[in-house]
UniProtKB/Swiss-Prot annotation:
Catalyzes the attachment of serine to tRNA(Ser). Is also able to aminoacylate tRNA(Sec) with serine, to form the misacylated tRNA L-seryl-tRNA(Sec), which will be further converted into selenocysteinyl-tRNA(Sec). Consists of two distinct domains, a catalytic core and a N-terminal extension that is involved in tRNA binding. InterPro entries: aa-tRNA-synt_IIb, aa-tRNA-synth_II, aa-tRNA-synth_II/BPL/LPL, Ser-tRNA-ligase_type_1, Ser-tRNA-synth_1_N, SerRS_1_N_sf, SerRS_core, tRNA-bd_arm. It holds the Pfam family tRNA-synt_2b. The gene is serS. Homodimer. The tRNA molecule binds across the dimer. It catalyses: tRNA(Ser) + L-serine + ATP = L-seryl-tRNA(Ser) + AMP + diphosphate + H(+); tRNA(Sec) + L-serine + ATP = L-seryl-tRNA(Sec) + AMP + diphosphate + H(+). The keyword Amino-acid biosynthesis does not apply. It comes from Thermococcus onnurineus (strain NA1). GO terms for cellular component: cytoplasm. Keywords: Aminoacyl-tRNA synthetase, ATP-binding, Cytoplasm, Ligase, Nucleotide-binding, Protein biosynthesis. L-serine binds at T252, A253, E254, E306, T406. HAMAP family: Ser_tRNA_synth_type1 (MF_00176). SUPFAM superfamilies: Class II aaRS and biotin synthetases, tRNA-binding arm. This is Serine--tRNA ligase.
Length: 457
């Protein structure tokens, strides 16, 4: 939520930012907010003046009572003032509700470094890491996507899609999951279960070493929390509601971690607060019909390790860079080639002032796909959830800044591992950093396991 003072003092800045975001229809809201705010403040002044007059009348009534003089005329005036105050207070309440309606639906102010663009096609790659395995048939599109700035190795065999790898490894059963739960669900099986858990523990250990407090949050939150952390459109497109309850299944651990300190005043000395949340995530994926319908890349349920920071405003941009760096280190140790993308205004969403994505090279698909998002939400969430801090007891509290970033979403990380670390024979060579968590170094196709077993008989 934006600060009403910002709109009062710099309406052109807010309008200009809406233009950058392509939210043209909301520009007129700013003038409407200013007009409503003017009436609201005028009414408050009138109420204060009337209260002053009522207090003066009370003094006069007291004096007349002592003197034994009639007070009927003064009581009539006082009662009339009370009625006027009640009318104005009702108007103030209605005006405030109208102002809040707009404020709660305005996006965050973007950082000056955010590129202007209409959609994800205009996001800007800013750096690349790793040596990509590129099938010769994908070479030209790879060079285009990597801007010629990424090292690569050309291979003459086409890596399998993760969907096909899941089948030959017997790593998932999507057909039976569809029977039980519908589309975009899956049973994870065999070594991939261990791999999923290994990825969680690897990311968790790394962040604990960096001073993050591990948290398993509630998997359901109340509506006021969801309203505080995300845009209203997400209630239709993303979030599952528990029928008959004021509870919603979390689409990310970011949401309960943001709500953790709702309506609190934090001690300045305790900032930054660093949390790493581990949770399942539940998403409707409405509006994505036809996209990634096969496999486990875009699903209704998955595990995720999430970084979350409450920081001082002056430190939040530094923390934004640290969060994306943490995520990059994770994917570097997993030996997954990737690019970091600065998300443009048209793809940014309402909550973030700036967002980076990490997009992993998917050797089977021949393109980069999102595996991490890291956002600085500045005070947009903190205002909605009333999360403030102060350094001294009698100091006026200030709003914190909130930041979040994926550390690892296991289903997408598994997709990246299956597509990048497979051999021509279909063996998956796991990155060394996971060996101590998995207890094995590679995953064999099912037919190879059968041969192994037959040889032992």
């Amino acid at each position: 939520m934006l600060d009403i003072k910002l709109i009062r003092e710099n309406p052109d800045l807010v309008k200009g930012d809406l233009i950058k975001r392509g939210e043209i229809e909301k520009i007129k809201w700013i003038d409407e907010i200013l007009e409503l705010d003017k009436k609201w403040r005028e009414n408050l002044r009138k109420i204060n003046q009337l209260r002053k007059e009522r207090n003066q009348l009370a003094v006069q009534i007291g004096k007349r009572k002592k003197a034994g003089e009639p007070i009927d005329d003064l009581l009539a005036k006082s009662n009339e003032i009370v009625k006027q105050i009640e009318t104005l207070e009702k108007e103030v309440e209605e005006l405030r509700a109208k102002i809040d309606y707009y404020l709660w639906r305005l996006p965050n102010i973007t950082h000056e470094s955010v590129p202007i663009g209409k959609d994800d096609s205009e996001n800007v790659p800013i750096r690349f890491w790793g040596k990509a395995k590129v099938w010769e048939g994908f070479l030209e599109t790879f060079k285009e996507q990597s801007l010629g700035k990424m090292d690569y190795e050309v291979i003459d065999w086409r890596p399998r899609l993760h969907v096909d790898m899941l089948e030959i490894l017997r790593g998932a059963d999507i057909e039976r999951a569809a029977k039980v739960s519908g589309s975009r669900f899956y049973y994870l099986l065999n070594e991939l279960v261990i791999l999923d858990l290994a990825l969680i523990r690897f990311a968790l250990d790394k962040l604990i070493e960096k001073g993050f407090i591990p948290v398993i949050p509630p998997y359901m939150v109340r509506r006021y929390v969801e309203e505080g952390v995300t845009s209203f459109g997400d209630f239709e497109d993303v979030i599952y509601k528990v029928e008959g309850e004021d509870l919603y299944l979390i689409p990310t651990a970011e949401h309960p971690l943001a709500g953790m300190h709702a309506n609190e005043i934090l001690e300045g000395k305790d900032l930054p607060l660093l949390y790493v949340g581990i949770s399942p995530c539940f998403r409707k994926e409405a509006g994505t019909a036809g996209k990634d319908t096969k496999g486990i890349f875009r699903v209704h349920q998955f595990h995720k390790v999430e970084q979350f920071v409450y920081s001082r405003p002056e430190e939040s941009w530094e923390w934004h860079e640290k969060l994306i760096q943490n995520a990059e280190e994770i994917f570097q140790e997993l030996e997954i080639p990737y690019r970091v993308v600065n998300i443009c205004t048209g793809d940014l969403g309402y909550v973030a002032a700036k967002k980076y994505d990490i997009e992993a090279w998917m050797a089977g698909q021949g393109k980069f796909r999102e595996v991490v998002s890291a956002s600085n939400c500045t005070e947009w969430q903190a205002r909605r959830l009333n999360i403030r801090y102060r350094d001294k007891t009698h100091e006026k509290p200030k709003f914190v800044h909130t930041l979040n970033s994926t550390a690892i979403a296991t289903s997408r990380a598994i997709v990246a591992i299956l597509e990048n670390h497979q051999t021509e024979e279909g063996v998956v060579k796991l990155p060394k950093v996971l060996w101590k968590y998995t207890g094995f170094k590679e995953i064999l196709p099912a037919h190879m396991k059968e041969k192994c077993c037959q040889g032992l008989e």
